[in-house]
Amino acid sequence: GYGIKNSDYSWGGDSHAVDNSGDGGGRDFDMFLLSFSESVTLENAAFTWVVGDNDSKEVTVAGLNSIAAFESGANSTWNTVTSAIVENTLGHYGVGSKGSNGLYESTFTKLTGSAKYWLIGAYNTIFDDNAKSNFNSVQLKLSSIGVSMTQPTAEVSEPGALALMGLGLGLVLYRRKRRV
């Protein structure tokens, strides 16, 4: 990561990666908190470095409606954060093999919800109701993300459109009547 240092690093991994390996044998879950000015849907992520394999559960993403749990002085746990997850924004995904672009990619196919705040990081069992007690550790260095944004459709009010059409028709008839 760009200038990011994992403070629970001491066991031989990379201190610049997010992981789900705790210091001294315990578990912790490192995640990036991303903030956007508008609600977006995460489409994919690319990683420059990946260590570990946990099949289809190597990356966890979650859209949040609030980041109050992360504010200074907040006494929060991961269970507190789960209450802020937006519907249809939570998912666990595998990371593919290194592509021709030199990146490992993960596509978030089942996310349909959007949010202004997103967590993305190593697989987090707290957010998985079907989590097994035993899983392999994963370490990731995030390179880029892909997002999409639903553009609101511009609606035209019917009374205004009908009045404008009526005025246009009236002018056409008036011009036609003057010529005759």
Predicted regions: what they are:
Residues 1-28:
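N-terminal targeting leaders for non-cytosolic proteins
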Residues 30-32:
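The right-handed parallel beta-helix/beta-solenoid scaffold, focusing on the short coil/turn
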Residues 37-44:
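Extended extracellular/luminal ectodomain segments enriched in beta-structured repeat modules
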Residues 46-52:
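Solvent-exposed strand-to-loop "edge" motifs in beta-rich extracellular domains
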Residues 53-70:
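Short, surface-exposed beta-strand/strand-loop-strand elements in extracellular ectodomains
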Residues 73-154:
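Terminal, low-complexity interaction segments
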Residues 157-175:
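A short, hydrophobic C-terminal helix/tail in secreted or cell-surface proteins
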Residues 177-180:
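Short, charged juxtamembrane terminal tails flanking transmembrane helices
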